[in-house]
């Protein structure tokens, strides 16, 4: 024993290195063990749903998964197969997995896809935007858009996950919670933005549109990867050296919020009325005064024009802060002032990379149901629509309130109902 301790003392550098390696290895193994426990618990919970008997005249739910293997730097396929796929199969659903090979493929596949009971998106913001756009571009979108959508956050940017699921620092738990939310079946309606250019078909967004200097600097962060934790500040610092002040000139026309209609009552099966009642109803509708004669004049929409000079403009939905009790539906137009200093640009820009909802002090926010953004010719630059880059051009943006139903964590849904946004 004495020889053992003497050896450790004489080789203290190797001992220290070995102890550090052993500690790290133990921590890594413990983390893997905890992840396996989370997966097992989630699978057991899903199996309860899979063991439930279905009525003889009912069919097994069909779920179509759109998986983007390239998401999360190529790790999405492994993350899905280890953490989400077993839960979906154990839940009793008939699961079909479609792996996308190139950008835009999901949109094309959805135009040809037959009916399904559930649509599941396994990827990030870009994959989700493709699927939503594909759904809403269909000729039968009025009925097809009623199919609930599940979102399994596998990408580097998954903005909607904060709205639909509880916060979690553990990647495995976050994925299993999102998958279990699909199995449990609780849904929440979300707004959609329809963004239409002059020539192309409309694009649909769940989060919003950004145009400005903060966005331009943020997309260049990966270029300075070799600077490690300083890469975000470096991207914004070098952006200030090219041009200052950085202003974006444009004009915007918009209309105010619209009144939210009451929730439609749940459809309940009713007995067919007797032949006598049906004849009376037909006669009453035949002799009734035409509806056009009773219609009242609808006041025309009031459009307001704003000339703006901004460092960044954003047009966003309220999906990040849902308020089920709100009496109005609107999108937010945020115009950030172009009078900030270089130091504030670097500081605030670094924070906006992690939290795009953050705004500069003095930002003007407008509420609208639709708007038209006009950009001067030759302005250049790019839009960021749900974290995907598009060429900047004049666009019409229209809010489609509560257009799509998304699966959400029951705990999160209960929190929305009991603690509405102020």
Curated annotation (Swiss-Prot):
Pathway participation: Lipid metabolism; glycerolipid metabolism
Subcellular compartments: Mitochondrion inner membrane; Mitochondrion intermembrane space
Cofactor(s) the protein requires to work: Mg(2+)
Catalytic activity reported: a monoacylglycerol + ATP = a monoacyl-sn-glycero-3-phosphate + ADP + H(+); a 1,2-diacyl-sn-glycerol + ATP = a 1,2-diacyl-sn-glycero-3-phosphate + ADP + H(+); an N-acylsphing-4-enine + ATP = an N-acylsphing-4-enine 1-phosphate + ADP + H(+); 1-(9Z-octadecenoyl)-sn-glycerol + ATP = 1-(9Z-octadecenoyl)-sn-glycero-3-phosphate + ADP + H(+)
Hydrophobic: annotated span: 15-31
Coiled coil: none
Membrane-related topology note: Peripheral membrane protein
Tissue: Highly expressed in muscle, heart, kidney and brain.
Record-listed N6-acetyllysine modification sites: 6
Quaternary data: Component of the TIM22 complex, which core is composed of TIMM22, associated with TIMM10 (TIMM10A and/or TIMM10B), TIMM9, AGK and TIMM29. Interacts with SMIM26.
Descriptive protein name: Acylglycerol kinase, mitochondrial
Gene behind this protein: AGK
């Amino acid at each position: 024993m004495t020889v053992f301790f003497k050896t450790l003392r004489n080789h203290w550098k190797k001992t220290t290195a070995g102890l550090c390696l052993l500690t790290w290895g133990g921590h890594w193994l413990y983390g893997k063990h905890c992840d396996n426990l989370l997966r097992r618990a989630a699978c057991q919970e899903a199996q309860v749903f899979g063991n439930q008997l279905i009525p003889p005249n009912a069919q097994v739910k069909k779920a179509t998964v759109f998986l983007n293997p390239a998401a999360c730097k190529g790790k999405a396929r492994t993350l899905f197969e280890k953490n989400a796929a077993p839960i979906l199969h154990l839940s009793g659903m008939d699961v079909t997995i479609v792996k996308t090979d190139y950008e835009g493929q999901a949109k094309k596949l959805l135009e040809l896809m037959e009916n399904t009971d559930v649509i599941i998106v396994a990827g990030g913001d870009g994959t989700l935007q493709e699927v939503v756009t594909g759904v809403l571009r269909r000729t039968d979108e009025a009925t097809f858009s009623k199919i609930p959508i599940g979102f399994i956050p596998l990408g580097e940017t998954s903005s909607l996950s904060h709205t639909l699921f509880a916060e979690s620092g553990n990647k495995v738990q976050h994925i299993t919670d999102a998958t279990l939310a699909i199995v449990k079946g609780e849904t929440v309606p979300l707004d959609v933005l329809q963004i239409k250019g002059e020539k192309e078909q409309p694009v649909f967004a769940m989060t919003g549109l950004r145009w400005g200097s903060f966005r331009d600097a943020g997309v260049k962060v990966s270029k300075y990867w070799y600077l490690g934790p300083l890469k975000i500040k470096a991207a914004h610092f070098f952006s200030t050296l090219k041009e200052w002040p950085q202003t974006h000139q444009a004009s915007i026309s918009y209309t105010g919020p619209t009144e939210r209609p009451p929730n439609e009552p749940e459809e309940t099966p009713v007995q067919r009325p007797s032949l006598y009642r049906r004849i009376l109803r037909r006669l009453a509708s035949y002799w009734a005064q035409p509806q056009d004669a009773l219609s009242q004049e609808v006041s025309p929409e009031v459009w307001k024009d704003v000339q703006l000079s901004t460092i960044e403009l954003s047009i966003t939905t309220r999906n990040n802060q849902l308020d089920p009790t709100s009496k109005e539906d609107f999108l937010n137009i945020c115009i950030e002032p172009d009078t900030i200093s270089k130091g504030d640009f670097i500081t605030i820009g670094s924070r906006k990379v992690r939290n795009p909802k953050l705004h500069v002090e003095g930002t003007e926010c407008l509420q609208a149901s639709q708007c038209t953004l006009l950009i001067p010719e030759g302005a250049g630059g790019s839009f960021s629509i749900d974290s995907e880059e598009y060429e900047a051009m004049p666009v019409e943006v229209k809010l489609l309130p509560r257009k799509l139903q998304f699966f959400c964590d029951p705990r999160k849904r209960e929190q929305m109902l009991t603690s509405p946004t102020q």
